[in-house]
Amino acid sequence: MSLSIVSYYGSQQSKCGYCAGANCSLSHGMHAYQLDCRDYQDLIDRGWRRCGYYCYKLRNQETCCPCYTIKCNGLEFKLSKSNKRILRRINRFLRDGKRESKPEAGDGDGEADADYAIVAPEVTASEPQPQLPDKSPPVINVEQVASLATAQRKPTKQATAAAVEAPTLGSNKSSLLSSSAAAPISNKPCKKAKQMRLDRRLAKLGDSASYSTKSLTQEKTLRDFLNTDSETNKHRLKLRLIHVYDDEFRRTLPQSFALYKKYQISIHNDPPKDQDAYKEHLQATPLQNEKPWDGPEMGYGSFHQQYWLDDKLIAVGVIDILPGCVSSVYFFYDPDYSFLSLGTYGSLREIELVQSLAEKVPSLKYYYMGFYIHSCPKMRYKGKLSPSYLLCPETYEWLPLTDVIRAKLDEHKYQRLNEDPAARDVNEFLMEHLDEVKLLLGGRTRTDYKHFRQLRGTVSDDDIIIEYSKLVGKECARRMLYVK
């Protein structure tokens, strides 16, 4: 694992990007110098979210607009009539080159096409950019800390010698006996390889037979709708997935920044930002580009998925690829192509990416859409992707987004969600875990809270460290380095 290093800011108060209220958005914030992708997966499963290097978690019981982390199971995803309508519209445009000025009357299923209603991203995971704290985090040499950590992990000569001298499992009869007791050996005879091959062949024949009877009535899948490229098409749509620090990102930066600026001005009426602000918002990332042998080909980390229509960049999806999900960070597109409902199309493409990645990494089967804000009607669109799940803000368990939960949120904007009063957070940080919290002192010395307290005696910021540890959970508190 890579090293995660964070500096906790504490409680924050700012203008709300959803209801536009002044100083009513309440959150906890921290700066992430760098994050292991597994640690960030654990953090977003506790309600955290990142914007560049800044990570924040809403104080849902107090804030004006409670935010619930939402995800969709990509492998069980069901296309709605509205989804199919949009996919057919795009396929017709690619095939014939004809623009439809508006959706056909009566072709909907009760779902509004927000791209036509307010020309805004309608099924994307984009959130308003959080207001960053005024204070700057302590300056540390991340590379130096990481190299020291690597050196500390290398075995010493004494440790190596001890390992050589240690008896093997086979040299100790009692250890073999205890091993057998722990894992009972099955009495069933092992199948021969030839028999196993025959069983697999029969299973395949059975699958193909059952498929042939179902194929006539089987509905088209998301992949069926997306795989319609043809040499006779008037337009060609190509997707490119590039890491945010690749040469290809730098080469296409002028096009992506120009597109972002056009989107911000036209869609959100925001003043144009300079290129540095764009990079700080949508390129900067604390996530390390990790490429484990059992991970996806491109590895984990932060990426831009670019949509090229012929030779023109028309949309960009900013995503994090993590061990358990594709997390959508932001999506922007060319307003000239709003008739294609690119906001929804981008989400469908990102779900298809989840389905593709899950073929190699089965655990990577979820699509995270950021926050579901029920008290803000324009942000309820995220719940239309099915099946969707909301994160309980107290037990951190996932619960299906049902009409029952929607009704509860209609009654009161903050809800525990998990109705079992006995349910607890399995990753809850308790005072007995305090000694194990990892610290980084003076930008270079790694220790834990127990040794730090022995060294310093009374610790003045106990409460802050405890608050941080409760928010990130006991596992991340044990792994991540808290900068002091």
From Swiss-Prot:
Role: Involved in the post-translational conjugation of arginine to the N-terminal aspartate or glutamate of a protein. This arginylation is required for degradation of the protein via the ubiquitin pathway. Does not arginylate cysteine residues.
A GO term for molecular function: arginyl-tRNA--protein transferase activity
Organism encoding this protein: Drosophila melanogaster (Fruit fly)
Record keywords: Acyltransferase, Transferase, Ubl conjugation pathway
One annotated GO biological process: ubiquitin-dependent protein catabolic process via the N-end rule pathway
Family: Belongs to the R-transferase family.
Domain of life of the organism encoding this protein: Eukaryota
Broad enzyme group: transferase
Protein name, as recorded: Arginyl-tRNA--protein transferase 1
Enzyme Commission identifier(s): 2.3.2.8
Catalytic activity: an N-terminal L-alpha-aminoacyl-[protein] + L-arginyl-tRNA(Arg) = an N-terminal L-arginyl-L-aminoacyl-[protein] + tRNA(Arg) + H(+)
GO CC entries: cytoplasm
